[in-house]
Curated annotation (Swiss-Prot):
Coiled-coil stretches: none
Source organism phylogeny: Bacteria, Pseudomonadati, Pseudomonadota, Gammaproteobacteria, Lysobacterales
GO BP annotations, alphabetical order: glutaminyl-tRNA aminoacylation; glutamyl-tRNA aminoacylation
Cellular location(s): Cytoplasm
Residues annotated as binding L-glutamine: 74, 218
Keyword Metal-binding among record annotations: no
Organism annotation: Xylella fastidiosa (strain M12)
Motif ('HIGH' region): 41-51
Summary of subunit composition and partner proteins: Monomer.
GO annotations of cellular component type: cytosol
Pfam families xrefs: tRNA-synt_1c, tRNA-synt_1c_C, tRNA-synt_1c_C2
Protein name: Glutamine--tRNA ligase
Gene name, Swiss-Prot/TrEMBL: glnS
Binding site for ATP: 42-44, 48-54, 237, 285-286, 293-295
Gene Ontology molecular function: ATP binding; glutamine-tRNA ligase activity
Major location category of this protein: cytoplasm
């Protein structure tokens, strides 16, 4: 795995996007002396390709400016979270090549968040509200109509503090009370109409057990966690732009830098004291055609068994993309290529595929395989003919060395490389025609062997003995070159041909009463059984190859072994997708 270091990042050409420009100005003006970012996923599912953009930005910015990035599990909704998701998140971030300076959890700060809430109550900035969720929505108003104050808005700080402590003690059932910020029920920003800061939820937490029957809401916990950790720049996607005034409200009214006593529970646990006044900056989220990235929809695909799990190679989770054969370098190149802006746009899926092709073309060794094999018998060679040919592992990179490839009288070739009635422009095998066998010489087809039903079962041909590599006849011009695998030495392999999961560009388009389920591509996975040269079988899982003339393939992360090779097609050699 390639790892991104501060030195590596600083050696790259200077990036000019608006976020980095803001950071440069903050450093130049002395607003900050160092940069501290964070990546704060909720451990309630697997990361997807959209998260890769945030990861590369959060960690990349920190590395470029010699700073740090914290990985924080935003674990404030325990009913939907799982330690397995938290472990997968750490694995995915590491796989992408990034390393966090600290692993934190919002639950690490529950005591501090509780004390901060008590401070807001004492300052008259928060109150306990008895409205249920439906009533809260009714009182909140609309975009064109101001909200109404809760009947409980004017409770005294003492009464609110007593009720909040009873909430903390577990006295009240779920949903009966919330702690709300006291801001402005007439605000044009609905997020500022007395948003909830805490709700009652008697649910066991993966880290704190049953200690807490109340949990902080996202906006409150997120803002203060940033401040607690000393985050300087809190990078979020555009949907949080309207939440920024609430983010700032929480930070400014709790004011941790001037109320350091609130941090005592952390200091007692050995956490550093590093509160800050972070700045939230929003950027556009990643949208790609032919995909859905809603966690709810991805979960439905798995739960309804429309795919084969979260790491199905057709999924857009990082686990799925990794199993498909996407590399960390290709993912980082993709994020770099699409750039950072505030403008929402839809990226064509081919951009992602081209980044993978570009990376694998450089690093992937070449091998020969047939996915629709047909026998070719070179009848002018002895039946026991066998030799070892020397092939380069990579035609553009001598440092990858060479390999031996067995060659014999009987070969497997690709069925699609022969045509009895060839179309115009055909350059491969035809009856009586010639073709170059990669690295072995020029062959002519003399006979087409068919079974009783008239199906072709083999070709018989002749190998020009003067056209072998190094001989004068090897320079004779023929129209086409095909790959092959020596039949006696071939290793049978399961080859999974993956394609895009959806057949239309906008599977989220619910027109005509259809949903994304109606646009699943029936050809997104085909399993064939072919043959590979021995050098392709003897390799570890997650090893990428270019199967010559076929595409880029990777040994399956879970199912491959040398005795039962399993290859996943990562991407074709060129973009052949038919657009609408």
């Amino acid at each position: 795995m390639s790892e991104i270091t501060t030195t590596d990042a600083q050696a790259q050409p200077e990036k000019k996007d608006f976020i980095r420009q803001i950071i440069r100005e903050d450093l130049a003006h002395g607003t900050h002396t160092h940069i501290h970012t964070r990546f704060p996923p909720e451990p309630n599912g697997y990361l997807h390709i959209g998260h890769a953009k945030a990861i590369c930005l959060d960690f990349g910015v920190a590395a470029e400016f010699g700073g740090h990035c914290t990985l924080r599990m935003d674990d404030t909704n325990p009913s939907k979270e799982d330690p397995a998701f938290a472990a997968a998140i750490q694995e995915d971030v590491s796989w992408l090549g990034f390393h966090w300076n600290a692993l934190r959890h919002t639950s690490d700060y529950f005591e501090v968040l509780y004390l901060a809430a008590e401070k807001l109550i004492a300052d008259g900035k928060a109150y306990v509200c008895d409205l249920n969720s439906e009533q809260v929505r009714e009182y909140r108003g609309t975009l064109t109509e101001a909200g109404r104050p809760s009947p409980w808005r004017e409770r005294s700080p003492d009464e609110n503090l007593e009720l909040f402590r009873q909430m903390r003690a577990g006295t009240f059932p779920d949903g009966t009370r919330t702690l709300r910020a006291k801001i402005d029920m007439a605000s044009g920003n609905i997020n500022l109409r007395d948003p909830a800061l805490y709700r009652i939820k008697h649910v066991e937490h993966q880290n704190t057990g049953n200690t807490w029957p109340i949990y902080p809401m996202y906006d409150f916990a997120h803002a203060l966690s940033d401040a607690i950790e000393g985050i300087t720049h809190s990078l979020c996607t555009l949907e949080f732009e309207d939440h920024r005034p609430l983010y700032d409200w929480c930070i400014n009214h709790v004011d941790l830098p001037n109320n350091s006593h609130l941090l005592k529970p952390l200091l007692d646990k050995g956490f550093p004291q590093e509160p800050s006044q972070p700045r939230q900056i929003e950027f556009s989220r990643l949208n790609i055609n032919y995909t859905v990235m809603s966690k709810r929809k991805l979960t439905a695909l798995v739960d309804e068994k429309l795919v084969e799990g979260w790491d199905d190679p057709r999924m857009y989770t990082l686990q799925g993309l990794r199993r498909r054969g996407y590399t960390p370098a290709a993912m980082r190149l993709f994020v770099e290529r699409i750039g950072i802006s505030k403008q929402n746009s839809i990226i064509d899926f081919s951009v992602l595929e081209n980044c993978l092709r570009e990376n694998l073309d450089t690093i992937a060794p070449r091998r020969m395989a047939t996915i629709a094999p047909m026998k070719l018998v070179l009848t002018n060679l002895p039946e026991d003919h066998e030799e070892q040919l020397i092939f380069p592992n990579h035609p553009k990179d001598d440092t990858q060395g060479t390999r031996t490839v067995p060659f014999s009288r009987e070969l497997w070739i690709e069925r699609d490389d022969f045509s009895e009635v060839p179309p115009k422009g055909w350059k491969r095998l035809v009856p009586g025609g010639e073709v170059r066998l990669r690295g072995a010489g020029i062959a002519r087809i003399d006979e087409v062997v068919k079974n009783a039903e008239g199906h072709i079962i083999a070709l018989h041909g002749w190998l020009d003995p003067t056209s072998r590599p190094g001989m004068e006849g090897a320079h004779r011009k023929v129209k086409g070159t095909i790959h092959w695998v020596s039949a006696p030495h071939a290793v049978a392999a399961e080859i999974r041909l993956y394609d895009r999961l959806f057949s239309i560009e906008k599977p989220d388009d619910n027109t005509d009463g259809k949903t994304y389920r109606d646009f699943l591509n029936p050809d997104s996975k085909r399993v064939v059984h072919g043959y590979i040269e021995p050098a392709a079988a003897q390799t570890a899982p997650e090893h990428a190859f270019q199967f010559e003339r076929l595409g880029y393939f990777v040994t399956d992360r879970h199912d491959h072994d040398a005795t039962h090779p399993v290859f996943n097609r990562s991407v074709t050699l060129r973009d052949t997708w038919q657009r609408d």
